[in-house]
C-alpha cells in the first residue's frame, strides 16, 4: 500500500514568479505530490490523514542545470557521472543536462546510452553534438541524435562556421530543438 502524507503547515514555492505560500499544505502519495493548499487538506481529511507540522521547511521545485560539463563521465580522475549526480541531488537539483564534449563526443545515437542511472530520482538529459567529433567541420546526424533522446544540440566551446550553421538550417533536421552555440 502507498503511504499518504500531509505536510501541514509547510512553506510552498510553486514557481519563481509567484509569492511564497507560508502556512500552506502539501499532500503526497508515495513519492508523488498530489495536492497543495486547501485541496491537500480536504483530500487528507477524506482519507483520515493527519498533518505533520513542517512550518519551518520549504517545499519548492527542484533546480535544473541545463548545461553541465563532464569530460570523463565514467572514468574521470575527478568528477564522474555518479559523483555529479550525488552532488547535484544533495544541492537540490532534480534534473541536469550534460553537454556533449566528453571523452566520447556524443555525436551519434549509440553514444547517448548508459547515462540514466537506475534507482535515481535525478533525471539526466543529454545534449547531442552539433558537429562530428565536436570539431566544427562536419555536421553530426541531428535527426538521429534527437530521435535517440538528445534534448538539443551543442557546438561546444567553438563557434561553427557560418556555412556549417547555414547547412544545418537548410537540412532542417533540428526541427524545433534548441541549439547551443558559444558566444
What are the language-model segments listed below?
Residues 5, 62-64, 179-181:
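Residue-level marker for buried hydrophobic side chains located in beta-strands
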Residues 41, 54-114:
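Metal-associated gating/positioning segment near the N- to mid-region
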Residues 30, 46-50, 120-122:
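Short glycine/proline-enriched coil/turn segments at helix->beta-strand junctions
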Residues 85-183:
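Divalent-metal coordination cores built from histidine and acidic residues
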Residues 10, 26, 31, 56, ...:
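Divalent metal-coordination and catalytic microenvironments
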Residues 1-46:
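N-terminal metal-binding scaffold of metallo-dependent hydrolase/deaminase domains
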Residues 4, 48-51, 94, 151:
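Conserved acidic residues
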